[in-house]
Amino acid sequence: TILKIMENLISYEKITGTTGMSNISNCTSYVTKIGSFAICSMNISVITDYTKAVIKSPVAFKEGVFITIEDNNGDLYSTNRQQVIGWYNPATQTFEASNINAGFTVLLIGRI
């Protein structure tokens, strides 16, 4: 039936952990999958502020994933710097970020 098809088309998952990451103390990801697309919101805390971090997506996105970052604490400090995001590597499911203060949110959208 149509209802069963829709139930199998959309899924949601909450994932926690920092395996495969560096300079990350905590990470909680919220993943919504719709067919062959996924939206992943990651709430992340860094160990050392403004130092490069390697972040691993809990979702194996294909090439062409959209990534954006919001530094949730950056505007609170006079040392605020421009955030930098590296390219997503589909082979390792990782990307790099820098100039982040304390906690931040990442949004990834792409094909799976």
Where are each of the predicted segments found?
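Extracellular attachment/recognition segments
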Residues: S25, I34-I112
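Glycine-rich, low-complexity segments
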Residues: T1-G35, I39, K62-E63
